[in-house]
Amino acid sequence: MQGEHGVQELRETDPRTIGPYQVLGRLGSGGMGEVYLAEARGGLRLAVKVVRAEHAEDRTFRARFRHEVRAAQTVGGAGTYTARVVDADTEAARPWMATEFVQGPNLRDAVLDRGPLPADTVRLLAAALAEALAAIHAKGLVHRDLKPSNILLAPDGPRVIDFGIVRALEGTALTRTGVVVGSVGYLSPEQIRNGAQVVPASDVFSLGAVLAYASGGREPFGEGQDSVVLLRILTGDVDLSAVPKEQLPLVEACLRDDPAARPTPAELVAAAGHSEASLREGLRPG
């Protein structure tokens, strides 16, 4: 999670520096590790994710984390709607990765605080997130964990964070027991059946669930125990009753069970009613 309003005070056990950066506060934590707000000497603010000690001790995790970070460093920059990876140390006792700090709430918190997004905003969001997926996929990455809390709403458009990094957890000693890696309500059917078969179209399914949440204000596959939610995804038991009619065709196309039947990111941009130029214009601050 990011945003100045979400910065928490450091605990006694938290680091005061990470690599060359001064740590200013806590931004959150998750299955991968802790996230801190840090600052470079020149004043640039960063979100630094520090891997949990138990993951750092796993050789498989380290190798995959190293590979995924290198790939992630090639993604980003102007117009990609992704948070750029600025620095990383994959050989540290606890590996870390620093991305540009994005000022703004995540999509999950925004919907919880203010309710479903307006139709025009959802169309812009759909096109921008499709552009982000195109940039990620072009580098040979699959996000694997696209969800509302991994989408930050900056004044000049959304930013997708944590792309590809969840793959480092797959197949490690901590997940070899068949535990599904990712946020269950946004996983594609093929991720549930066999995580090794994840393809770029898997992210498109997750995007469909994200857009259903953004436009309808509720989890499309409901809540409850993980096993129950996963079964709903596998059986196509989705509740889109809160999604406005004009958004339904796009959402339903993304949520098709067959990955090959889902639209590509480029098709999604067009389906959302935008070209690259109109998207830039629509997301211009002010």
Segments from the language model and where they lie:
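Eukaryotic protein kinase
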Residues: M1-P285
